[in-house]
Curated annotation (Swiss-Prot):
NAD(+) binds at residues 12-14, 33-37, 63-64, 85, 89, 157, 181. Belongs to the NAD(P)-dependent epimerase/dehydratase family. Enhanced activity by NaCl. Enhanced activity by NAD(+). Strongly inhibited by UDP. One of its GO terms (biological process) is galactose metabolic process. Pathway: Carbohydrate metabolism; galactose metabolism. Optimum pH is 7.0-9.0. This is UDP-glucose 4-epimerase 2. It comes from Arabidopsis thaliana.
Length: 350
């Protein structure tokens, strides 16, 4: 019988790609999502892409803070593990609305952990983030690097990591893997699912794709005087399909009897500048991206990229795709879905 996995936030960007990989890997997936920053359209497309495997997918519109609704789902299915993506994730908004972020992300997680314990499901993969490294003094960031988030969003990730460690310390039956991932980019090679941010994109590449399809006039590059090869900020961009595979590898690792509460970086181990990413996208799409140069944004780190040795060694996982593949698949998604899953804006059908 297929192993059954609960995926919170499974309608989101990384969640939907991971759900597809779960189904294709022989798992059954139950998704809970409140659709605050996603839509059910992504899961309908996942179901289609998965073909017959799509029969092993079900999804429910549930907020993790709604304990009775969560208990009902746990009472109906015996889960082997939970992959926890759900959470608000805009850095700027978190600064403006910290209590919203603490309530949604932390209270939601605590409720989830309580219900998991209540129903005897103590296997968890948590989506943390490289944002917990703050402004790293040294790169690459290893799992032992100091952690100090610089905004409320990052602090919710950091606090949830600590909560997970405390839960494991109190009960050694728990097996928890914390995945700190870097900058996800790209889309499923089919171009049928991808990133569809609501409102103004917070990250570089979704913004670039909206410029390319004519939804925005130009890209503003914040900071051109960093001590980097071209003066722009450097990040570790990772293909979303590699990231999805990393979650499957983490799920398999939970079967290891020696696992307690472990942290793994998921990145490529390579730093790429803003201008290098834009150039790679221009090459993949054949589109010129107009740029406006601006000063640094407060809080932006200069260079952040991952040490990936631990994940390679212990999860037997390594990112396969480079920035060319990321940009190719991103453009395939964007050009086929210029308005994302919202078909009403461009007159096409989902």
């Amino acid at each position: 019988m297929a192993k059954s996995v609960l995926v919170t936030g499974g309608a989101g960007y990384i969640g939907s790609h991971t759900v597809l990989q779960l189904l294709e890997g022989g798992y059954s997936a139950v998704v809970v999502d409140n659709y605050d920053n996603s839509s059910a359209a992504s899961l309908q497309r996942v179901k289609k892409l998965a073909g017959e495997n799509g029969n092993r997918l079900s999804f429910h519109q549930v907020d993790l803070r709604d304990r009775p609704a969560l208990e009902k789902i746990f009472s109906e299915t015996k889960f082997d593990a939970v992959i926890h993506f759900a959470g608000l994730k805009a850095v700027g908004e978190s600064v403006e609305k910290p209590l919203l972020y603490y309530n949604n992300n932390i209270v939601g997680t605590v409720t989830l952990l309580e219900v998991m314990a209540q129903y005897g499901c103590k296997n968890l993969v948590f989506s943390s983030s490289a944002t917990v490294y703050g402004w790293p003094k040294e790169v690459p960031c290893t799992e032992e690097s100091p952690i100090s988030a610089t905004n409320p969003y990052g602090r919710t990730k950091l606090f949830i990591e600590e909560i997970c460690r405390d839960v494991h310390r109190s009960d050694s039956e728990w097996k928890i893997i914390l995945l700190r991932y870097f900058n996800p980019v790209g889309a499923h090679p089919s171009g049928y699912i991808g990133e569809d941010p609501l409102g103004v994109p917070n990250n570089l590449m979704p913004y670039v794709q909206q410029v390319a399809v004519g939804r925005r006039p130009h890209l503003t590059v914040f900071g051109t005087d960093y001590k980097t090869k071209d003066g722009t900020g450097v990040r570790d961009y990772i293909h979303v399909m590699d990231l999805a595979d990393g979650h499957i590898a983490a799920l398999r690792k939970l079967d290891d009897l020696k696992i307690s509460c472990e942290v793994y970086n998921l990145g490529t181990g390579n730093g790429t500048s803003v201008l290098e990413m834009v150039a790679a996208f221009e090459k993949a799409s054949g589109k010129k991206i107009p740029l406006v140069m601006a000063g640094r944004r407060p809080g932006d780190a200069e260079v952040v990229y991952a040490s990936t040795e631990k994940a390679e060694r212990e999860l037997n996982w390594k990112a396969k795709n480079g920035i060319e593949e990321m940009c190719r698949d991103l453009w395939n998604w964007a050009s086929n879905n210029p308005y994302g899953y919202n078909s009403s804006s461009n007159g096409s059908s989902s």
